[in-house]
Amino acid sequence: RDRSVSRGLGDVYKRQNTGSKSEDVSAAAGETYKLEYTPTLKTYGFTEPVVLKAKPQRVVSLVHTPVLALHEMGIKQVAVPQAAMLEWPADLVKDAKLLNVSMNSNFDIETVIALEPDLVIVGYQSKDTYGKILDREKIPVYYVDAGHVVSYESIKELTDVLIKAFGQHNAGAEAITDRFNKLEARMAEKRQENKGQKVMVLQSAPPRHYIQGKDGTLGSMLNMLGYENVYQNNKMVLIDLEQALSYEPDLLFCVGGSKTAAEHQQVMEEDFAKNPEYWNNIKAIREREVIYLPIKYVATAGINVIDNINELIDIIDAKKLKQNG
């Protein structure tokens, strides 16, 4: 499949006639851009790298994860997915078409083909649907990890691949690497500090409250900060009220669909007030050891995970300061 991709690339460029002089020179010099597959994708059987004959000028991302990294490295995207959990940068959306690729939309891959992309980035689950059609059109496809929860590790792996392929001597790429390195150092420090502290994570749309383990979006962030999750299962389920009384977390984190933390706090406190006999049995609620978070902690969108974790650390630090102050 991948060999046909590099063959097909030539056709794409002939079809578009977009090659500038410098591109022709780099192609003539045999310079290629190689997208290796990440360790995660290799476990799903994607092994052959995607080789591009020239730096892509018309990328379509059907997944959120690569969008910000490509944007910061100056790689032009002609279409990106709509995003509920964050605002894309204004200078990205002024040139890029917003695609509704949510599960239930009747997304038509023909709209992508019409944009004449020179690279399409697709979730690995769509290999047999969108992938087949794009292959037939000889459009290069690169598959990535996708789904409701894309782990920090997975985002970091993909970003490393994109930097290797397109980020040589690139200030944007260097800045991203620097931010990851600073975050890693900060998280290592917090892991020491938070050792032995127990947390519970509720993802709620009252009156429904789901409990999240260490594999959820927020649960995994707290895990990387050294907290122990009281819920040892990795499947998010409706909270068992009886069982929850035995958990005794030091700190409760509440996340949901609200745009701001204050809005989510209001929604949750109204719900707690409907059944105070129950909720006040949980020490963290009784003693206000609760941190409320907005929708951006429900799902990540690529390298904004760096900002989200940094902000989470700041929020927790501010709460500790207030207590000790």
Named regions from a protein language model:
Residues 153-178, 188, 194, 254-325:
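Structured C-terminal subdomain patch of bacterial secreted/periplasmic proteins
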Residues 11-65, 169-200, 314-325:
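Bacterial Sec-exported substrate-binding components of ABC uptake systems
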Residues 1-13:
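Single conserved hydrophobic/aromatic residue that forms the stacking wall/gate
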Residues 101, 109-122, 241-254:
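Proline-aspartate-enriched helix->loop->beta-strand connector
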Residues 88, 127-131, 144-161, 196-217, ...:
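Extracytoplasmic ligand-binding site segments that recognize negatively charged/polar headgroups
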Residues 62-115, 119:
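A short, structured surface patch at a secondary-structure boundary
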Residues 85-87, 211-237:
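Alpha-helical, coiled-coil/dimerization segments enriched in small aliphatic residues
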Residues 41-46, 96-110, 234-241:
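Short helix-initiation/N-cap motifs at beta->coil->alpha
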